[in-house]
Amino acid sequence: MGFPYKITVFTPTYNRAYIIENLYRSLQRQSYTDFEWLVVDDGSADNPRELFERWQKENNPFPIRYVKQENGGKCRAINRGLELAQGELFFTVDSDDYLTDDALEKVAAWDAELPDKEHYCGFVGNRGTTPTETPNRLFEGRFLDGTALDRYTMVEPDQVLVDGERAFVFYTEVHRKYMYPEFPGEKFLTEAVTWDRMAYEGYKMRFYNDIIWIYEYKNDGLTKAGSKLFLN
């Protein structure tokens, strides 16, 4: 099928009205503009709707779509985003982080240079604490072809091939074949559930060292909260 946009920047959000503007401003600074910003609000209590209604009236080169749903967890929000996405590429970006100014330009370039696209489910950029600093291991060369399972492939006794937090970009049509399972009463499910299924079924990914996503850990972030949920 044809898509009206090259990229859907998808953001699931929950009680992030105090910080999501950082992401919005980074989208305004993008050097590439063939994208939409799709936000699924997973039952926030801090009323971000007012922010989005104001931003939708600003003169942006990209559309903003805001949808609110009953709180069901990040993966349910991603499922909703996949159903609504109008971009060929589906790039989930957390609401408390932001992108480098050339992030989407790089994503579009990676898509353009990818051979045999039918064998790939997408590609992966790097995350950093600044545009030039990352705690992640850098591999040799411009890119590395592999699968999501390379996050578990050991290259040294205490080192995996692809480590740390990464920025995953998927082909929307492929990701729609691998929606997240939904269980009654369960709100937390790791995204790796579908990434690994794609890998087991033969889909490759192309990994890049380039930093396109800036992050810092928050005390109330999903990674920390998820660890508590697993412990419980």
Which sequence ranges carry the predicted segments?
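N-proximal low-complexity "stem/linker" segments adjacent to membrane-targeting elements
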Residues: 1-26
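Short, acidic, metal-binding catalytic loop of nucleotide-sugar glycosyltransferases
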Residues: 25-34
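A conserved acidic beta->alpha catalytic loop
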Residues: 26, 41-51, 94
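Short beta-strand/loop segment that forms part of the nucleotide-sugar
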Residues: 34-43, 65-69, 95
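Glycine-rich, basic loop-to-helix element that forms the pyrophosphate-binding segment
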Residues: 69-85
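Short aromatic/hydrophobic "clamp" motif used to bind/position activated sugar donors
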Residues: 90
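Conserved donor NDP-sugar-binding/catalytic core segment of glycosyltransferases
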Residues: 102-139
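Conserved nucleotide-sugar donor-binding catalytic segment
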Residues: 129, 135-224
